[in-house]
UniProtKB/Swiss-Prot annotation:
One of its GO terms (biological process) is DNA recombination. It comes from Rickettsia felis (strain ATCC VR-1525 / URRWXCal2). It holds the Pfam family SMC_N. It comes from the Bacteria. Belongs to the RecN family. NCBIfam families: recN (TIGR00634). ATP binds at residues 29-36. One of its GO terms (cellular component) is bacterial nucleoid. Keywords: ATP-binding, DNA damage, DNA repair, Nucleotide-binding. This is DNA repair protein RecN. GO terms for molecular function: ATP binding. May be involved in recombinational repair of damaged DNA.
Length: 546
């Protein structure tokens, strides 16, 4: 509910502050006193379109602050929009002379859209030019469902609808991606089969690289041994040594050649020893466990697979596990596709059964609401008005059912009913809304409801009936009424008077909460005009039950 309203430099207002109470609050004042300025200030603060020239002449800014109480719905909205809830809700709009508007919620800057969304949780406004909520199709549907106690049933239908739509979406995604899913399954099937068969182990690449290096070194040594053996196994070497020894032997015991003969003999023996050593070394090479060609083939294969899947060799095992998991998911999607289609058909059937039941319930509720509203309209001097609720099948199923709901009315005898916004004046729309609110009473209650001149064109007993209904409504929500009718004002819990004062160089608007004596005087003025009489004072006293 509204706690307070602070307005500065707004149109004709220098500065004013109003503190509101629970129950019924009436705002009165002479015609042209500026009562509509308060509504403009509220709409301005909450992001709705108002007059372009709202900054008071001679000032460089205008500002409006409103403080509201909180409920859980408002708190949830604030949290969803990353605004910290406090004990009370402070909303503010500041406009500077250059034209820029700044909106604040709890001193946090927000955009206009957020402010307008918040406003829908705070209050309803009904008046000469503001009955938007009644005219919206969603509001009309909510009014009917609330009246018929159908909101829980509608919630069940909505849940079924969401499940149905989610299933349809999942099927559509599978169908749309069928080709890519098939391709991915083929790819993953091949990859997992290939990697499973290769069974590449962690550290295997490094191990094979080291073995390859060792084998390459051994090959070099082997080739060297073979090359040396090839040279020293040359028969000509042995033949040459033997010939040299024989030539020296012919010299007999010639000491001069004895040392040379000994050297030749040692050379022969050393050569034989070298041959034997190289042969033994050759026999010592072991190729049973690893083969360079096979080692290189495996190593190069691992490197190729690593490049192919763009995965480090040591992570190929992890890649295989993830691929197997993804392959299972995709195969399950395909397997579940037919199951989803069957489920979608069942959900569709259930939805239309629930929607059909809801339509029947709405038709029954509509008849009762039409009758209730007709009785209320009689009391509000609209006995000849016809109100009916048209329910027709919608073009598309929705979370709220398969019905298009239109509130229709005729305010003049002989005229066909049309959509309510096309045939009713602002005052009539307000009384339609009051009749609806009275019929609903404790259902669909916003924290505050504002009625702007709901009593235009009525008086006497009808005005008293309007006041009674406003008073009744104020027992479940805060009701703020701008009125010209003393019968309505007399039932107020809080009476605020707006006055316009013409000074020498400017016009000022002031606001005052009236005490009991001041209320009597104001009601007397409303009854008899500027000249207050004893009779009007007496009538005012009776209205106040003094």
């Amino acid at each position: 509910m509204f706690h307070s309203l602070l307005v500065k430099n707004f149109i004709l207002i220098d500065e004013l502050e109003i503190e509101f109470n629970k129950g019924l609050c009436v705002i009165t004042g002479e015609t042209g006193a500026g009562k509509s300025i308060l509504l403009d200030a509220i709409l301005f603060c909450l992001g709705y379109k108002t007059s372009n020239n709202i900054i008071k002449r001679g000032k460089d800014y205008a500002v409006v602050n409103i403080i509201f109480s909180l409920n859980e719905e408002i708190k949830n909205f604030l949290i969803q929009n990353f605004i910290e809830p406090e004990e009370l809700l402070l909303v503010k709009c500041l406009q500077k002379a250059e034209g820029r508007k700044n909106f604040f919620i709890n001193n946090q800057v927000v955009n206009k859209a957020i402010m307008q969304q918040l406003a829908t949780y705070l209050f309803e406004l009904h008046g000469q030019n503001n009955n938007i909520s009644l005219l919206e199709a969603n509001t009309q549907r909510d009014i009917l469902d609330s009246y018929g106690n159908l909101l829980d049933f509608r919630a069940e239908l909505s849940k079924c609808y969401q499940t149905w739509q989610n299933t349809r979406k999942e099927i559509a995604e599978i169908t749309l991606k069928q080709n890519s899913i098939d391709q991915e399954i083929d790819y993953l099937s091949f990859a997992t089969e290939e990697l499973t068969k290769l069974n590449i182990q962690i550290g295997e690449e490094e191990k094979l690289a080291n073995i390859r290096k060792d084998l390459q070194n051994k090959d070099k040594d082997l080739q060297l041994i073979k090359d040396v053996l090839e040279q020293i196994n040359n028969p000509e070497i042995n033949t040459s040594i033997n010939r040299a020894e024989k030539l020296l032997a012919r010299q007999g015991d010639n000491e001069r050649f004895e040392a040379i003969a000994t050297s030749l003999e040692e050379a022969y023996n050393n050569l034989e020893e070298a041959r034997q050593g190289l042969s033994n070394l050759l026999d010592s090479f072991n190729y049973e466990e690893y083969n360079l060609e096979e080692t290189e083939e495996r190593l190069f294969l691992i490197k190729a697979i690593s490049r192919k899947y763009n995965v480090p060799a040591d992570e190929l095992g992890i890649f295989l596990d993830k691929s197997l998991e993804q392959l299972g998911i995709l195969k399950n999607k395909i397997a579940n596709s037919n199951e989803l289609k069957a489920q979608e058909m069942l959900l569709q059937k259930k939805y239309y059964e629930l929607a059909s039941d809801l339509s029947v319930k709405r038709l029954i509720a509509a008849k009762h609401l039409e009758e209730s509203l007709h009785q209320e309209l009689k009391q509000l001097k609209m006995a000849k008005a016809i109100f009916e609720i048209e329910i027709i099948a919608g073009k598309e199923p929705t979370a709220s059912g398969n019905d298009d709901i239109v509130f229709k009315a005729s305010t003049n005898p002989g005229m066909a009913t049309e959509a309510i916004n096309k045939i009713a004046s602002g005052g009539e729309l307000s009384r339609f809304m009051l009749a609806l609110k009275t019929s609903l009473f404790d259902k669909m209650v916003k924290p505050s409801i504002i009625f702007d001149e709901i009593d235009v064109g009525i008086g006497g007993e009808v005005a008293d009936k309007v006041g009674e209904r406003l008073k009744k409504l104020s027992s479940v929500t805060q009701v703020i009424v701008i009125t010209h009718q003393p019968q309505v004002a007399g039932k107020a819990d809080l009476h605020i008077k707006i006055e316009k004062t013409q000074l020498e160089k400017e016009t000022k608007v002031t606001v005052k909460a009236l005490n009991l004596a001041e209320r009597q005087e104001e009601l007397a003025r409303m009854i008899s005009g500027k000249t207050i009489t004893e009779a009007s004072l007496k009538a005012a006293k009776e209205l106040l039950h003094l």
